[in-house]
UniProtKB/Swiss-Prot annotation:
It is a multi-pass membrane protein. GO terms for cellular component: membrane. Belongs to the anion channel-forming bestrophin (TC 1.A.46) family. Calcium-sensitive chloride channel subfamily. It is found in: Membrane. Keywords: Membrane, Repeat, Transmembrane, Transmembrane helix. Disulfide bonds: none annotated. This is Bestrophin-6. Signal peptide: none annotated. The lineage of its organism: Eukaryota, Metazoa, Ecdysozoa, Nematoda, Chromadorea. The chain crosses the membrane at residues 29-49, 68-88, 231-251, 265-285. One of its GO terms (molecular function) is chloride channel activity.
Length: 382
């Protein structure tokens, strides 16, 4: 599911930070808590083993890890920044191309004449578009595949008839199954155009373009799934970050605490700085892992099934409510009818119009005469 925290940060406040920080679902704590626990076990295991060694072996142990003590994660930060940027761009590309039905539904419902046959054709076009979306999503999203494991489930849900399902299954769909319902939708529109049910050729073309754009968006999402980021790139990042913290389990130890090192006593028992690094770097990496495939089943992955339901019901609603109510006078015809707010509204911005930064600066009176002159060659503009 998508975890919403927008209301918690609607107004900046001191406690708003804690509301977001102590969330569990979709949080960085949920992403890293297992690996942080495993790392702490490794850290204290190394410390316990060191305590069992004699002095000579302790010296050998310390000499072997001295090479890693000053190793800093700056290169990891550099690598992670590029990797996460790439992942977020792909995530945004998937989100903007998942297929939202509104534009196509508005075009289909607005540019055609009224009539029962036209209404049925409009509803059929919407159903075909959503059926095409289902065929795409069930090939790239495990959530959609669990809901529609076969064509019979699509028929049962009402997105296809048995006859339509049979035709699709009997078609060679080795490369793309979603093209068939899209083609049917275009054919329905074409038949309605030939029957004279479109107001003009230009609006028919506009409707056809919206249907085509819907298919284009679905095609882009499918291609993102087909061609992921080259495997070597995430392998390097995943391996490098985890290897760094394995090294830290040895190199960031405070093995012996002298009297002069009393200020480090807390680090002797708990590696605060290294744990902070772990939360930041490993959390950053886990964010990238979660966004790498936003159509999976993580807490913050996209709600594919909700989008399918929203598209079919919203599209049908737009078709059924395309006829507006009778036109009547509105209250705003009275120029003295001002903005109305409930009595309990205390918004400080009420009555404060947004305006340009120098709009209220008066350099001359309303009717003042301004002396002007022509800009000549010897008097260039400033």
């Amino acid at each position: 599911m998508t975890i919403s925290y927008t209301y918690d940060v609607a107004t900046e406040s001191y406690f708003g930070f804690f509301k977001v920080l102590f969330r569990w679902k979709g949080s960085v704590w949920k992403l890293i808590h297992r690996e942080l626990f495993m790392w702490l076990v490794l850290y204290y295991t190394v410390l316990a083993i060191y305590r069992t060694l004699d002095e000579e072996r302790k010296k050998i142990f310390r000499s072997n890890i001295e090479h890693f003590i000053n190793f800093e994660p700056s290169i990891l930060t550099f690598m992670l920044s590029f990797f996460v940027t790439t992942i977020v761009q792909r995530w945004n590309n998937v989100f903007t191309n998942m297929g939202f039905i509104e534009n196509a539904a508005y075009a289909v419902s607005s540019f055609m004449k009224n009539g029962e046959d036209v209404r049925r054709a409009q509803r059929t076009v919407i159903r075909y578009l959503v059926a095409s979306q289902i065929l795409v999503m069930r090939s790239i999203s495990i959530k959609a595949l669990r809901r529609f494991p076969n064509y019979e489930s699509i028929v049962t849900a009402g997105f296809l008839t048995k006859e339509e399902s049979t035709i699709i299954q009997n078609t060679d769909l080795s490369y793309d199954s979603s093209c068939v319902p899209i083609r049917w939708a275009i054919q329905v529109l074409r038949h309605q155009y030939r029957s004279g049910n479109f107001f003009s050729h230009s609006v028919y073309r506009a409707t056809w373009k919206e249907v085509s754009d819907f298919e284009t968006h679905l095609s882009r999402v499918r291609k993102v799934d087909w061609v992921p980021i080259p495997l070597a790139y995430p392998q390097v990042i995943f391996f490098a970050v985890r290897l760094y913290f394995v090294i830290c389990a040895f190199a960031k130890q405070y093995f012996d605490l002298d009297d002069d090192d009393a200020r480090y006593v807390i680090h002797y028992y708990f590696p605060i700085v290294t744990v902070f690094q772990f939360i930041c770097l490993m959390g950053w990496l886990k964010v990238a892992e979660a966004l790498l495939n936003p159509l999976g089943e993580d807490d913050d992955d996209f709600e594919v099934n909700f989008l399918i339901d929203s598209n079919i019901y919203t599209g049908m609603l737009i078709i059924e409510t395309s006829k507006p109510p009778p036109l009547k006078p509105d209250l705003f015809e009275d120029r003295n009818f001002g903005p109305i707010y409930p009595n309990n509204i205390t918004d400080q911005s009420v009555g404060q119009a947004l305006c340009g930064s120098v709009e209220n600066i008066k350099l001359a009176g309303k009717d003042a005469s301004i002396e002007v002159k022509k800009n000549g060659e010897n008097n260039p503009p400033a």
